[in-house]
């Protein structure tokens, strides 16, 4: 009678040994997996209850609370515009006036802090108000110079016979600078606030490539250099109008902090209160035009939130 019982016990114990072997192997494997070193892109956060949670380290230019600052240099282009002048004894418009930017010759001025306002520069300071969305404060210091060697269409009236005589067949030649010199070279300052959306395109060790796009709105604060009819040159800062833009950029970020930025933007500027005299007379000009801009420079980004 004992032999059948031993056979039954043997049949029951074999599966139990197999299950125990599988359980031990599973525990060993789990110990191996959970005992691995946490990836360098993860963060360990300790809570008050003593529980430790591992979370992915945020990519640069992606997370709410991140900040960046940027300084760079630009080239600009402007559409032709109609410029309307009003003042004591005149009310006229010059049509289809062309203009260009005025980049500073490459040299030490581009890296000398005491001369940084001489060049066409850009400044950005951004704060991520939510993941992948930043509120960006910007200063675009462009330079706008009316092309002097041009003949433009004229419409309106001038009471001074000397300058009225310069209008021939409904046109005026600006080449000799006696009638008008007109520029915003200190500069065409566009102070703007924008919203920018960011997307990480490439994430490698110590290098990220990030694309952004957005729009901005702001006011124009030019220092306009205008000399009309031989009057004293107007050369002062003044809030003259408003601007708006669309922009897109590529950002290379190294070691999660240092960044190189290249940006293109297009926008519209309307200035209805350009001062044309040094005094407080009501003399002024107004113009509107479309602009394009490309810029590049360097910056730095960091997290405001501390991680343990």
Where do the model's predicted regions map?
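Bacterial Sec-dependent N-terminal signal peptides
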Residues: 1-44, 308
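Short glycine/proline- and aromatic-enriched beta-strand/turn motifs that initiate or cap beta-hairpins
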Residues: 37-127, 293-295, 299-307
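Extracellular loop and loop/strand-boundary signature of outer-membrane beta-barrel proteins
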Residues: 55-57, 108-111, 177-183, 228-237, ...
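Gram-negative (and chloroplast) outer-membrane scaffold detector with strong preference
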Residues: 60-65, 124-227, 299-304
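Residues that define the transmembrane beta-barrel architecture of outer-membrane proteins
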Residues: 63-67, 117-121, 185-191, 209, ...
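Outer-membrane beta-barrel translocator domains and adjoining extracellular loop/strand segments
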Residues: 81-87, 148-154, 223-232, 273-281
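Predominantly the C-terminal beta-signal and adjacent terminal strand-loop region
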Residues: 81-84, 90, 249, 253-308
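Flexible, solvent-exposed coil segments and beta strand-coil junctions
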Residues: 98-106, 169-177, 224-230, 274-279
